[in-house]
Amino acid sequence: MPRDKSENHEKIVEAAYEEFMTYGFNEASMRRIASNCQMSASGLYKHFSSKEDMFASLVEPAYQGLKEKYNKILDEEYKDIKNKSAEDIWEGDEETVWVTKYIYDNYNAFKLLVCKSQGTAYENFIHELASMEEMATIEYIEKLKENGIKTNPIPKKELHLFVTSNINAIFETVVHDFSKKEAIAYAKRLDEYCVAGWKRIFGLSE
Protein backbone atom coordinates (compact mmCIF):
# COMPACT_ATOMS: atom_id res chain seq x y z
CA MET A 1 0.00 0.00 0.00
CA PRO A 2 1.15 3.63 -0.53
CA ARG A 3 3.97 4.71 1.76
CA ASP A 4 4.03 8.41 1.02
CA LYS A 5 1.22 10.97 0.78
CA SER A 6 3.27 13.76 -0.85
CA GLU A 7 1.90 16.12 -3.46
CA ASN A 8 3.25 13.78 -6.16
CA HIS A 9 1.10 10.89 -5.01
CA GLU A 10 -2.04 11.74 -7.01
CA LYS A 11 0.07 12.26 -10.11
CA ILE A 12 1.56 8.79 -9.64
CA VAL A 13 -1.86 7.21 -9.10
CA GLU A 14 -3.18 8.77 -12.33
CA ALA A 15 -0.11 7.67 -14.28
CA ALA A 16 -0.32 4.16 -12.83
CA TYR A 17 -3.97 3.83 -13.83
CA GLU A 18 -3.20 4.90 -17.40
CA GLU A 19 -0.22 2.53 -17.55
CA PHE A 20 -2.20 -0.48 -16.35
CA MET A 21 -5.12 0.34 -18.63
CA THR A 22 -2.84 0.69 -21.64
CA TYR A 23 -0.48 -2.23 -21.08
CA GLY A 24 -2.17 -4.49 -18.54
CA PHE A 25 -0.42 -5.53 -15.36
CA ASN A 26 2.14 -7.91 -16.89
CA GLU A 27 3.45 -5.44 -19.45
CA ALA A 28 3.18 -2.32 -17.28
CA SER A 29 6.49 -0.65 -16.46
CA MET A 30 7.39 1.10 -13.22
CA ARG A 31 10.10 3.00 -15.12
CA ARG A 32 7.57 4.24 -17.66
CA ILE A 33 5.22 5.36 -14.87
CA ALA A 34 8.11 7.18 -13.20
CA SER A 35 9.05 8.84 -16.48
CA ASN A 36 5.47 10.00 -17.06
CA CYS A 37 5.55 11.55 -13.59
CA GLN A 38 8.94 13.16 -14.32
CA MET A 39 10.61 11.36 -11.47
CA SER A 40 13.12 8.54 -11.00
CA ALA A 41 12.14 4.90 -10.54
CA SER A 42 13.75 5.00 -7.09
CA GLY A 43 11.53 7.97 -6.26
CA LEU A 44 8.50 5.93 -7.27
CA TYR A 45 9.43 3.21 -4.79
CA LYS A 46 9.12 5.73 -1.99
CA HIS A 47 5.38 5.63 -2.70
CA PHE A 48 4.88 1.96 -3.60
CA SER A 49 7.03 -1.04 -2.75
CA SER A 50 6.29 -2.89 -6.00
CA LYS A 51 4.15 -2.99 -9.11
CA GLU A 52 1.84 -5.42 -7.29
CA ASP A 53 1.51 -2.97 -4.41
CA MET A 54 0.66 -0.18 -6.83
CA PHE A 55 -2.03 -2.21 -8.59
CA ALA A 56 -3.52 -3.29 -5.28
CA SER A 57 -3.77 0.32 -4.11
CA LEU A 58 -5.94 1.08 -7.15
CA VAL A 59 -8.38 -1.80 -6.77
CA GLU A 60 -8.38 -3.17 -3.21
CA PRO A 61 -10.49 -0.45 -1.50
CA ALA A 62 -13.32 -0.80 -4.04
CA TYR A 63 -13.13 -4.59 -4.12
CA GLN A 64 -13.10 -4.89 -0.34
CA GLY A 65 -15.97 -2.41 -0.13
CA LEU A 66 -18.06 -4.55 -2.48
CA LYS A 67 -17.52 -7.67 -0.36
CA GLU A 68 -18.33 -5.82 2.85
CA LYS A 69 -21.55 -4.40 1.41
CA TYR A 70 -22.50 -7.82 0.05
CA ASN A 71 -22.08 -9.45 3.47
CA LYS A 72 -24.09 -6.71 5.15
CA ILE A 73 -27.02 -7.12 2.75
CA LEU A 74 -26.76 -10.90 3.04
CA ASP A 75 -27.18 -10.66 6.82
CA GLU A 76 -30.30 -8.55 6.30
CA GLU A 77 -31.72 -11.11 3.86
CA TYR A 78 -31.16 -13.94 6.34
CA LYS A 79 -33.03 -12.01 9.03
CA ASP A 80 -35.92 -11.33 6.65
CA ILE A 81 -36.53 -14.96 5.64
CA LYS A 82 -39.06 -15.53 8.43
CA ASN A 83 -41.27 -12.82 6.92
CA LYS A 84 -41.36 -14.33 3.42
CA SER A 85 -43.40 -16.97 1.65
CA ALA A 86 -42.01 -19.11 -1.16
CA GLU A 87 -43.51 -16.72 -3.72
CA ASP A 88 -41.73 -13.75 -2.13
CA ILE A 89 -38.23 -15.22 -2.17
CA TRP A 90 -35.77 -13.00 -4.08
CA GLU A 91 -38.59 -10.74 -5.25
CA GLY A 92 -37.70 -7.05 -5.15
CA ASP A 93 -34.14 -7.62 -3.92
CA GLU A 94 -32.55 -6.04 -7.01
CA GLU A 95 -29.16 -7.44 -6.02
CA THR A 96 -27.74 -6.94 -9.50
CA VAL A 97 -28.84 -3.30 -9.50
CA TRP A 98 -27.07 -2.30 -6.30
CA VAL A 99 -23.96 -4.23 -7.34
CA THR A 100 -23.95 -2.43 -10.68
CA LYS A 101 -24.39 0.97 -9.05
CA TYR A 102 -21.47 0.22 -6.74
CA ILE A 103 -19.32 -0.92 -9.67
CA TYR A 104 -20.01 2.28 -11.59
CA ASP A 105 -19.41 4.44 -8.53
CA ASN A 106 -15.94 2.83 -8.49
CA TYR A 107 -15.61 2.32 -12.22
CA ASN A 108 -11.87 2.80 -12.70
CA ALA A 109 -11.05 0.21 -10.06
CA PHE A 110 -13.43 -2.36 -11.55
CA LYS A 111 -12.26 -1.66 -15.10
CA LEU A 112 -8.79 -2.66 -13.95
CA LEU A 113 -10.09 -5.69 -12.06
CA VAL A 114 -12.22 -6.96 -14.94
CA CYS A 115 -9.96 -6.17 -17.88
CA LYS A 116 -6.37 -5.75 -16.69
CA SER A 117 -5.76 -7.90 -13.61
CA GLN A 118 -4.16 -10.93 -15.27
CA GLY A 119 -0.92 -11.70 -13.46
CA THR A 120 -2.07 -10.18 -10.18
CA ALA A 121 -3.58 -11.62 -7.02
CA TYR A 122 -6.93 -10.35 -8.33
CA GLU A 123 -7.05 -12.20 -11.64
CA ASN A 124 -9.51 -14.75 -10.23
CA PHE A 125 -11.70 -12.23 -8.41
CA ILE A 126 -14.83 -13.34 -10.26
CA HIS A 127 -14.21 -16.91 -9.10
CA GLU A 128 -13.81 -15.61 -5.54
CA LEU A 129 -17.09 -13.70 -5.75
CA ALA A 130 -18.81 -16.73 -7.29
CA SER A 131 -17.57 -18.91 -4.42
CA MET A 132 -18.95 -16.39 -1.91
CA GLU A 133 -22.30 -16.34 -3.71
CA GLU A 134 -22.38 -20.13 -3.98
CA MET A 135 -21.83 -20.59 -0.24
CA ALA A 136 -24.35 -17.86 0.54
CA THR A 137 -26.96 -19.50 -1.71
CA ILE A 138 -26.47 -22.88 -0.04
CA GLU A 139 -26.85 -21.30 3.40
CA TYR A 140 -29.89 -19.32 2.24
CA ILE A 141 -31.59 -22.47 0.97
CA GLU A 142 -30.87 -24.22 4.28
CA LYS A 143 -32.49 -21.34 6.15
CA LEU A 144 -35.52 -21.55 3.87
CA LYS A 145 -35.88 -25.23 4.77
CA GLU A 146 -35.57 -24.38 8.47
CA ASN A 147 -38.51 -22.04 8.00
CA GLY A 148 -40.66 -24.65 6.29
CA ILE A 149 -40.06 -23.63 2.68
CA LYS A 150 -39.25 -26.64 0.51
CA THR A 151 -36.84 -26.39 -2.42
CA ASN A 152 -35.68 -28.66 -5.22
CA PRO A 153 -32.17 -30.09 -4.80
CA ILE A 154 -29.51 -28.84 -7.23
CA PRO A 155 -26.17 -30.64 -7.72
CA LYS A 156 -23.35 -28.54 -6.28
CA LYS A 157 -21.44 -28.65 -9.58
CA GLU A 158 -24.44 -27.22 -11.41
CA LEU A 159 -24.99 -24.56 -8.76
CA HIS A 160 -21.38 -23.43 -9.17
CA LEU A 161 -21.85 -23.02 -12.92
CA PHE A 162 -25.14 -21.15 -12.55
CA VAL A 163 -23.65 -18.77 -9.99
CA THR A 164 -20.48 -18.18 -12.00
CA SER A 165 -22.46 -17.36 -15.14
CA ASN A 166 -24.59 -14.96 -13.09
CA ILE A 167 -21.54 -13.13 -11.69
CA ASN A 168 -19.88 -12.98 -15.10
CA ALA A 169 -23.03 -11.48 -16.60
CA ILE A 170 -22.92 -8.59 -14.12
CA PHE A 171 -19.38 -7.57 -15.07
CA GLU A 172 -19.96 -7.84 -18.83
CA THR A 173 -21.18 -4.23 -18.80
CA VAL A 174 -17.67 -3.18 -17.80
CA VAL A 175 -16.09 -5.33 -20.51
CA HIS A 176 -18.36 -3.79 -23.14
CA ASP A 177 -18.07 -0.20 -21.89
CA PHE A 178 -21.72 0.35 -21.02
CA SER A 179 -22.57 3.75 -19.61
CA LYS A 180 -23.89 3.77 -16.04
CA LYS A 181 -27.41 4.40 -17.32
CA GLU A 182 -27.18 1.51 -19.79
CA ALA A 183 -25.68 -0.77 -17.15
CA ILE A 184 -28.43 -0.09 -14.60
CA ALA A 185 -31.15 -0.70 -17.20
CA TYR A 186 -29.47 -3.99 -18.10
CA ALA A 187 -29.07 -4.88 -14.40
CA LYS A 188 -32.81 -4.52 -13.82
CA ARG A 189 -33.55 -6.91 -16.67
CA LEU A 190 -30.82 -9.29 -15.55
CA ASP A 191 -32.35 -9.33 -12.06
CA GLU A 192 -35.74 -10.29 -13.51
CA TYR A 193 -34.13 -12.96 -15.68
CA CYS A 194 -32.07 -14.48 -12.86
CA VAL A 195 -34.78 -14.37 -10.20
CA ALA A 196 -37.21 -16.16 -12.52
CA GLY A 197 -34.57 -18.78 -13.30
CA TRP A 198 -33.50 -19.34 -9.70
CA LYS A 199 -37.09 -19.66 -8.52
CA ARG A 200 -37.87 -22.09 -11.31
CA ILE A 201 -34.98 -24.48 -10.69
CA PHE A 202 -35.38 -24.35 -6.91
CA GLY A 203 -39.11 -25.02 -7.25
CA LEU A 204 -40.18 -21.72 -5.70
CA SER A 205 -42.50 -20.75 -8.55
CA GLU A 206 -45.43 -22.48 -10.13
Task: Please tell me what each predicted stretch does.
Residues 141-194, 202-206:
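Hydrophobic/aromatic-rich alpha-helical bundle segments in the mid-to-C-terminal region
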